[in-house]
Structure formats: C-alpha cells, structure tokens
C-alpha cells in the first residue's frame, strides 16, 4: 500500500500594495497607456496599473465618458472595453 500523502501547506500570496487614491502620476499613466490596450476591464487595470478596483472603475468610467474607449460587452458584473476606433 502507498504511504499516506502529506497535506501541502498551500501557496501564500503576498498582499497587494496597490494605490488607493489617485495622484498626478497615476492619472497621467492611465491617460497615456490605457487607450492603447486592446482589452480593457477592471481586472486588467488592477493588474497592470497597480491600482485598486474602485479606482479602476472610476478611471474606466471617465475614459468612456470622454470617448477614449468604447464598451464592447457588459456582463452582470464585468464590463469589457476596447480602444475607440479612430475617427475616419
């Protein structure tokens, strides 16, 4: 009979040190980099910009209102955006 398998300790994830308030540098980075992303969602901004979810939602809402990005699909919780098509 095979020996009893030991329980693994599991992986420990470090606590994210994401920004919780907007400052000038974060706003500038969002305005410069996000319109170039092909796929834009709250989780993408949290991952790439190192901001928390509420800031990501505010940033996406602001960019959409200004017409910099456009909505592709809206799930019950997650909205998906893409860069705005170049006006021809």
Curated annotation (Swiss-Prot):
Q: What is its main location?
A: cytoplasm
Gene Ontology molecular function terms on file: structural constituent of ribosome
Q: Which domain of life is it from?
A: Eukaryota
State the Gene Ontology BP annotations.
cytoplasmic translation
Q: Which Gene3D superfamilies match?
A: 3.30.63.20
Q: Which family does it belong to?
A: Belongs to the eukaryotic ribosomal protein eS25 family.
Q: What is this protein called?
A: Small ribosomal subunit protein eS25B
